[in-house]
């Protein structure tokens, strides 16, 4: 085993060098709640130095093929160290070792996709001669890097979501200043070591650790940052957008994902997928199923089937192979979910399963008899709790799904093609998943939301569009 059993110290990664600072911060093992690592806390000078280094690196040629080679080598190195990274993930996040292995594999895939996309960045010919007075002119567009990209990543998927920002940014020819979540920074720091080994040119990647609010503010103040890409809460996303000015901003924010189970659905399939995709990573995923709308005709049968599937999930030590669900990221988050569930019960909800907390663990919880004004339906739970409500009519359930501040993804189980197409047209989300839960995602698909779920798209091909500028060249011959 190579998991974090001793407190290891990590510095900042700036201009290709590792630097320690006077102030340190502990990273906890989320299962034992004991220190697993110690990280350096960046100062404003460190932030400005990192941005200057990233800007300076842009002066050096980094061809599309070189980007491809570096990213492919990094993916190979990551796969060769899958178990090491998986154990770090299980330690610093608390997700199960099996789920952690899957995340590392997906992160490598994200780097591979980014590498391939680096070779496909191109412009197009523009027929300017069709305009009067433009005879003997030719025009074409090229895609150029936006420049210095500040990437701020969340705690819940700390290797794959880092790769979703780092991979496309580098593939597009940018430099990156990465700020990982302070509670789960180790995978990002280890990834910097790996990128260096893969041959990434000096200065193309900086990793800053420490207080997110402070570092984020300093990055926003620095006008040499050309773009911000952020995954996290709507509150912080709105703050970044308000302070970024005319600079590019891409935001992947919250959601209270809905999944519909229609009367013609395959109940076995629906219950199995929803159980899995409601409680993975203790429900701490932006597209985890939170609201479930079930047709009245099959409501009781579905609730029983979902309880049956969920009861089989094993809660425990993330390092145990049998474990499905580990602790939440912080004790206070488990306490918050506990409070929201208690509040729902006081307002009339019924606990069908779970509803209990043990330290930072919160048992997978199924609530019925809910209404759309309860916090567990209206806000983002970001924990292992789902709320099930009934519906009778298609228009009614579409209206319920849309009655939300969020719009990232939704799920729909049905064999009715007309319903599926109506939902595709009318449900206000960035992605509708038919015959799977809202939490379905593969890493090359476009991923992003509407309303308070953010703007812009992830998925390497689509993120590269966000991270480049289109420039037109006109030749007067």
Curated annotation (Swiss-Prot):
It holds the Pfam family Aldedh. It comes from the Bacteria. Keywords: Carbohydrate metabolism, NAD, Oxidoreductase. CDD domains: ALDH_y4uC (cd07149). Induction: Induced by growth on sulfoquinovose. NAD(+) binds at residues 232-233, 253, 380. Belongs to the aldehyde dehydrogenase family. The gene is sftD. It is an enzyme of class 1 (oxidoreductase). This is 3-sulfolactaldehyde dehydrogenase. InterPro entries: Ald_DH/histidinol_DH, Ald_DH_C, Ald_DH_N, Aldehyde_DH_dom, ALDH-related_metabolic_enz. The keyword Oxidoreductase applies. The keyword NAD applies. Coiled coil: none annotated. GO terms for molecular function: lactaldehyde dehydrogenase (NAD+) activity. Its EC number is 1.2.1.97. Part of the sulfo-TAL (or sulfo-SFT) pathway, a D-sulfoquinovose degradation pathway that produces sulfolactate (SL). Catalyzes the oxidation of 3-sulfolactaldehyde (SLA) to sulfolactate (SL). It comes from Priestia aryabhattai (Bacillus aryabhattai). The active site is at residues 252, 286. It catalyses: (2S)-3-sulfolactaldehyde + NAD(+) + H2O = (2S)-3-sulfolactate + NADH + 2 H(+). Gene3D superfamilies: Aldehyde Dehydrogenase, Chain A, domain 1, Aldehyde Dehydrogenase, Chain A, domain 2.
């Amino acid at each position: 085993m190579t998991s974090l059993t001793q407190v290891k110290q990590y510095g900042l990664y700036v201009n290709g060098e590792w630097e320690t600072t006077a102030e340190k911060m502990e990273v906890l093992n989320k299962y034992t709640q004991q220190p697993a690592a110690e990280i350096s806390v960046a100062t404003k000078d460190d932030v400005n130095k990192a941005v200057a280094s990233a800007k300076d690196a842009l002066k050096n040629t980094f061809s599309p093929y070189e980007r491809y080679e570096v990213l492919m080598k990094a993916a190979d190195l990551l796969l060769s160290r899958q178990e090491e990274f998986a154990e770090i993930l299980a330690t610093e996040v608390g997700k199960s070792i099996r789920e952690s292995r899957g995340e590392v594999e997906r992160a490598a895939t994200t780097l591979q996709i980014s590498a391939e996309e680096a070779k496909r960045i191109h412009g197009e010919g523009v027929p300017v001669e069709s305009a009067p007075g433009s005879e003997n002119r030719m025009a074409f567009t090229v895609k150029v890097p936006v420049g210095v990209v500040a990437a701020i990543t969340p705690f819940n998927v700390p290797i794959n979501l880092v790769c979703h920002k780092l991979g496309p940014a580098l593939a597009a020819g940018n430099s990156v200043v990465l700020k990982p979540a302070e509670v789960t920074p180790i995978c990002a720091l280890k990834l910097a070591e790996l990128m260096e080994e893969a041959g990434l040119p000096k200065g193309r990647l900086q990793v800053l650790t420490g207080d997110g609010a402070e570092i984020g503010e300093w990055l926003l103040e620095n006008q040499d940052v050309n773009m911000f890409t952020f995954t996290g809460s709507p509150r912080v996303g709105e703050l970044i957008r308000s302070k970024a000015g005319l600079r590019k901003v891409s935001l992947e924010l919250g959601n209270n994902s809905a999944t519909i189970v229609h009367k013609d659905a395959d109940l076995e399939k629906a219950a199995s997928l929803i159980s899995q995709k409601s409680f993975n990573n203790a429900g701490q995923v932006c597209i985890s199923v939170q609201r479930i709308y079930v047709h009245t005709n099959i409501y009781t049968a579905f609730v029983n089937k979902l309880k049956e599937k969920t009861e089989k999930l094993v809660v425990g030590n993330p390092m145990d192979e049998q474990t499905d669900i580990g602790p939440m990221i912080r004790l206070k988050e488990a306490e918050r979910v506990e409070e929201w569930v208690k509040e729902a019960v006081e307002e009339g909800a019924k606990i069908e399963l779970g509803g209990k907390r043990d330290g930072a663990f919160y048992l997978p919880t199924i609530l019925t008899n809910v209404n759309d004004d309860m916090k567990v339906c209206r806000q983002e739970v970001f924990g292992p709790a789902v709320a099930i409500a009934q519906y009778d009519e298609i228009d009614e359930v579409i209206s319920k799904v849309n009655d939300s501040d969020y719009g990232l993804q939704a799920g729909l189980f049905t064999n009715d093609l007309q319903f599926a197409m109506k939902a595709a047209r009318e449900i206000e989300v960035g992605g509708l998943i038919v015959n799977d839960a809202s939490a379905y995602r593969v890493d090359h698909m476009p991923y992003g939301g509407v309303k308070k779920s953010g703007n812009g798209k992830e998925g390497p091909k689509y993120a590269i569009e966000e991270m480049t500028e289109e420039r037109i060249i006109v030749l007067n011959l």
